[in-house]
Structures are given as structure tokens and as C-alpha cells.
Amino acid sequence: MMKSPPGQITRACQPHQVISLFAFAFGVNVCMGFTTNRVRRSEEWDEGPISVLSDSPWISTSGSCKNRCFELQEAEPPGCRCDNLCKSYNSCCFDFDELCLKTARGWECTKDRCGETRNDDNACHCSEDCLSRGDCCTNYQVVCKGETHWVDDDCEEIKTPECPAGFVRPPLIIFSVDGFRASYMKKGNKVMPNIEKLRSCGTHSPYMRPVYPTKTFPNLYTLATGLYPESHGIVGNSMYDPVFDASFSLRGREKFNHRWWGGQPIWITAAKQGVKAGTFFWSVVIPHERRILTILQWLTLPDNERPYVYAFYSEQPDAAGHRYGPFNSEMMVNPLREIDKTVGQLMDGLKQLKLHRCVNVIFVGDHGMEDTTCERTEFLSNYLSNVEDIILLPGSLGRIRPRSSNNLKYDPKVIVANLTCRKPDQHFKPYLKHHLPKRLHYAYNRRIEDVHLLVDRKWHVARKAVDVYKKPTGKCFFHGDHGYDNKINSMQTVFIGYGPTFKYKTKVPPFENIELYNVMCDLLGLKPAPNNGTHGSLNHLLRANVYKPTVPDEVAKPLYPVALPSASDFDIGCTCDDKKNKLDELNKRFHVKGMEEKHLLYGRPAVLYRTKYNILHHHDFESGYSETFLMPLWTSYTISKQAEVSGVPEHLASCVRPDLRISPGNSQSCLAYRGDKQLSYGFLFPPQLSSSAEAKYDAFLITNIIPMYPAFKKVWNYFQRVLVKRYATERNGVNVISGPIFDYDYDGLHDTPEKIKQFVEGSAIPVPTHYYAIITSCLDFTQPADKCDGPLSVLSYILPHRPDNDESCNSLEDESKWVEDLLKMHTARVRDIEQLTSLDFFRKTSRSYTEILSLKTYLHTFESEI
């Protein structure tokens, strides 16, 4: 069975519960609007021609499209259809083309057409009655009545919706563009004056981050549902389901089958709550101008028929980007101008209907575009001897499965090992899917193959040379592609919000597209279905907050244990030289209250599940110690800019002290480490950053140690010894919170103790799958971290805890050569950490909760500016 989506809501959101939602109106059309007659993609080299639904149950001669063009309801078979997707479903009435796809006299009024006699064969009208009949060309008022184009008007602040009588809410139009790289916006007013006006007059972000893989199907459906691909099930433009034993592709028939599509898209959410939705997808045979005119006509329908949510979809500039590459300015300008012209037609049409101060418009892309070509292709035949035994979904990422499901010799671990660090100039990195960076959220679905290749930007991967698609002339068919890691700058896309509900002339920080579903629900007054977004994190886009998020309730209250008077009963197999270390005197420090205000700058993290844990105070750090996991759930400390890194004296090199506040039965034992040659231990608070010689001893308490593979200690020690100090120096002090993560079933959620026992049966110490670190400072580096009264800055990591460092091909070199790159690959959001730990951070701060949610959903990408 398909896995449930990750997130707080997901264990109750099984796909078998939601697939049936597609039986509602419009749901059957979920996939076809962007699949017909598309440019061939790199990951479809081996696929056949595009298909439409054959053996249609609809009979074309069973009716006519007269007065039915682009009707909002789909006719039931055997009756024929006249809706926007009847072409894709091979279900149109015989006269659909003649009556509904008229192009006579073009799409614009000219002076000589003003006041023309109505001719029903025209594509749009310039007659005196066209306004009353709702079928004017969009420039009618400009050409025939002397009005100005919308783009030529000054920006105006629309403080409240100005809608005609009968409108119960501002309608929402989602204008989605395929392959719109964020940097295209730099072309500005000369190329895209209408889009530039939307940007400058409304709300925009420098870019919006797509989900991984940065492909069309996964991202359009994420925009519609707020779910990651592993959650909604559309994990690629092409995919294989081992339970269905069926393949899904842009060119195959399976895309028509509802069983592939999980989650609840916005149009179903609207329909379930009594809000009518217009169509979201269009067959490509319908010209852009006709799509715009149809939306405008729907807006003039009677109150009881009018939809309140619409979508327009453009196949450009993606098609041009694939063919010519994103940097071919000469060839990319025209597609961008055409999109801008269509935006202008929409806005002029809204103004003509006096709806330009009523309607909310979202202009959004699905992903970016990278420069690539056939010549930059890695062939697996240069690495593996058995490429005939595997199926590779090739291109800007690679997914590998056995050609035969009965191949008992196929071992994903062997494939990964044979592809790991084989060449010094290798342009892809192989992963078992559960080892992929957690920020990708790309593992917990049966349609995601066990072996995954992350491909370098600008490169492709293929099985062998003959798999690379070229023209018969031998020339490369494409010069651009997408699908790469979603944090790289070329994959970022555009977001603009314009209308009475969006803020005026406002720039907001970048965000991920999983958040837009909640915003769309807020714009329409809907309650969102469960999703992976963080509702309220984008409240700063809107004039008024429709939804007010609340801080989650703390479930487990901590205990504050006191130290026992004697250490005689604390035999945990650990040693420390009592004479040199003066342990009895040091144990008295347990009675001293810690420095919570210094080390818990943003309040104590809350535990959101039932468990028993203790707050342990120390001079240099605070810990939330779990008696279940025998280690801290979190440790927090603040390091000033002036802090010094000191060495560990020889007599402390192997010192581990018992903690008299925690009974031996609830502590780890040094004996467990002596008996396991594959496992060592590290420290959550680094002894090297202790503020004094006396305070250093606190770091050697057994309640500060965590199980670590020796290989991983290289990563952790470099992070603590070098990077934390560097961050503190660069950022004028930092607060660090770190701790363990247990995600053995790789569902992106906190594992229960029962779940962990299934994977580490017989182990005395539960070994984390990852460790996290949250580094927070003031956004204004002139302010010290502990005296910050402005916005905060955060970077976070989820570091894989593995017995080797094979992910880094140069891991035999000095740590300064590779550890930082590894950390950058495993950057993450605070929200990702919260879901993996069931902890809640930043609970005590003067900032608004919306600001905190924005901080939690921020991803530090380490990429250059767009």
C-alpha cells in the first residue's frame, strides 16, 4: 500500500481514503491539461507517442456543442462533451472545432472593427452589444471606447475588494507557467511589462522553491494539494507502481486512471465546501487567447453558476527553454513576450468587466530551467557491466530498478556501491533512497525506486549512448532541462500575488510551493485538507490574516531532578581519575541552577508526545534528557563572538562521568561501547567550547554523550570545533540546539520507541539515524545573538548518521576539504527537524508567531543570488 504523507497530519491521510475524491466534477481532468503535444523531455527518451483516451465511451454524434462551448459540467456518456478537455478524452461532439475553436478575425479589436455587425463566426467581438453579452475582445474598451490598457495605469492600492453585486467573495485566478526560471524576471519591463506591473504593484518573492524532483507533474500537483510528491504519489513525469504493475507517463493512458492521484486538490476542496471551481487544465489545442476569453466569460455567469476559482496554464516558456536553453536570449524573448501578452489580455479583460479591483491573481511557475545538452551526459555503461539488467529513468536525475522483478541477484546496495566515487570527474552521486537528504522528502513511497542518482547541474545521466535522444542528423534535440536538486538557483521559479487580498508593493522572502495550497484556501475562505504546508507561514503575504496559527500544546512536561548525595551506587562502567578531576567537588555543581536565560534564548523546546524526560542545568548548556532514549532529546547552548576553542587535556581524553541526577538504569553505560567495536560516542555540547576548566567537566557527563559511528565523529567534531566557532565569529554569536533523530522507516516523522525496537532489536543503545543542528543568530549581525531585538536568522542541518563517509568522495582528505560541503548538501528547515523529532522550537520570543513560522520554513540553500 502507498505510504501516508509525512507531516503531523499524515498517518490519518492514507491515499486509499482520498483517491475517491476524484469522482467529483473536474477531478477526472486532473492530468491532461499539460500532457498533450508537449516537447519531448529528457526522461522520456524511450517512450512512444502521446496518447489520448481511445475506445471512448462518449459518442461524438450523440449531440451538438451549440450553446455548450466550454461548459463547466462534463456530459455523461454516451452523450458527447464540449468542455475544455474533451479533445484529450476523445469525447467531443462532432462540431466542437467548428463552434468552440473559432479564430475568424483574430483575438483583438481594430479601429475598423469597432461597432461591427455581430458575426457569430468571429473568435471574439467588437460589436456594440459585446459588453452586455460578455464576449468582447479584451482590448475592446481600449480601441473602441478610448480607455487605457491596464498596464498603462498607475499602481493603485486596493484596500478592499470592489466587486459587482452578487459576488460573495473575490474570485481567484491561478496563472501558471511551465519552466519559468526566476531569473527571467530580470528581463523586466522591456520584455514583460504586464508581469512586471503585477510584480511591482502586488506581492512577490525573489523566487519560489519547487519540490523535488523539479518536474512538471509533481510540482503542478503539489501546487494544487500542498503535498510533497512522496505524499500525493506523483513522484515523477514517469513512474512505475510495483503493486499496480503499471507505468505512468506523459504519453501513456495510465495518467487517466484515478488510482495514481492522491491528496485533495484545491478544486475538490472548493467543491466539497460549496464553492464552484472552474476547470484547472486545458488541452493544448485550445489557444491561450481562447482560454482567457473563456475564463472571462465564466466570470460573467449568473451568481448561482459562476465559479470562484480558475486556472490558466501555459506550456511556455518551458518548451522554448528545453529546445534552446535558458540563456539563448534571442529565442527565449518571444515566448516570454507571448506570456506577457496573455497576462495583459487577462488584466485588460478584467478591467473591461470592472473586476480588476475584485479578482485575486496568482502568477506562478512550476520549476526553473538549466542549461544542458546531450554532450554533457554520463553513461552508466561506463560504470556497470550489467546495464541491460536495469531500467533507468534517465535525464536530470536517475531512478534505477531491475528490469525483471524476479531478478534475485539485483541488490540496490551493490548498485550504489558500484556507482559510488568511481571517477574523479563523476557528475552524479548515487543514493539509496532513504539516504537522500531529508529536505528532499523523496523516499517514503513505493513508486520511488530504491536507487536514486542526484545529477550535477547542467548534466544528464543515461544507461548507454544509444539511449540519448538526438535528431536524425545526430544533433542534440535539447539545450535545457530541469529536474535537478530543488535548492539550486536555476530550478527556482516565480511567484507573484496581485489583488485586493494581497499586500501592496510588498517583497517577501522566498518560500516553498507546498505553502501555496493553504494560501489559496485562505483567499477563498476554505478550510484546507491535511497537507505538508505550514498554515500561517505565509500570512505576511495577505492584507488580513484569515487563519491565525496557534502554538502547539506541550504534551510531555519535564521533570527537574536533583542530584543524589553520593556517587557510590552509580557504577556505569565509566572511568575518571578522581584525584585529578576532584569528582566529589565537581558533583556539587549539580545543585547550581543553570543559565536558562543565556542558553534557552527562545524558550525551552516542547515535547509533543508522551514520554518522560528531565531538564538538566549546566553552566554552559541546557539539556532535555530522555529516560526512554538514554540521551538528550535536545541540548542548547549560546556561543559568543569572543568564545575561544580550547583543547581537551590528556587526563580528560577518555573521561566520562556519571550524572547523579539520573539513575544508572536510565543512563547509558560505557560497557555498551566497549563491547561494540563499530560504535563510539560523541558529545552534544562540545567540551572544546567550555567557558572554563571547571565547566569543561560538565561536558563529560554521561548525560551529554550520544552514540556515534567513528566515521561520523569526523563530521560532528569538525562541525563543533570549527564551524560553530566560525558561525559565532561571523554572526556575532549564535545559539545552537542539537540532538538525535530516529527515522528508521524514513517516513519523515518521529519514530516511536516501539518502531525503533523493530530496527535495532537487541541493542542496549538506540542508535540515531541522523543528528540535527539549529544555528540561530540575529539577522542584523551588529547585534549579539543574546541581545537581538530584531528578526532572526537561522540555518539548520539534518546530518545522516552512517558508519562510513562514502557520500563524500574525498573523505580521506582533511575534514576542511569536505565536511562543509556535506553539511550544505544536508541543509534543512527547522520545520523538517520538528517533524522528525516531534519537538517544537522558538516558543518564547517577542516575535509574532507568523514570523516564527516563516523562520521555521526557511531553507538556507547556500546558493548564489538568483
Regions found by a protein language model. Name each.
Residues 375, 519, 538, 549-866:
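Domain-level detector for secreted/extracellular nuclease and nuclease-toxin modules, and
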Residues 392-506, 511-519:
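Active-site neighborhoods of enzymes that stabilize oxyanions during catalysis
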Residues 151-203:
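Active-site-proximal N-terminal segment of extracellular/periplasmic enzymes that hydrolyze or transfer
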Residues 222, 226-327:
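His/Asp/Glu-rich, glycine-adjacent segments
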Residues 22-64, 103-104, 147:
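N-terminal signal peptide
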Residues 57-150:
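Secreted, short cysteine-rich peptides and small extracellular cysteine-rich domains stabilized by multiple disulfide
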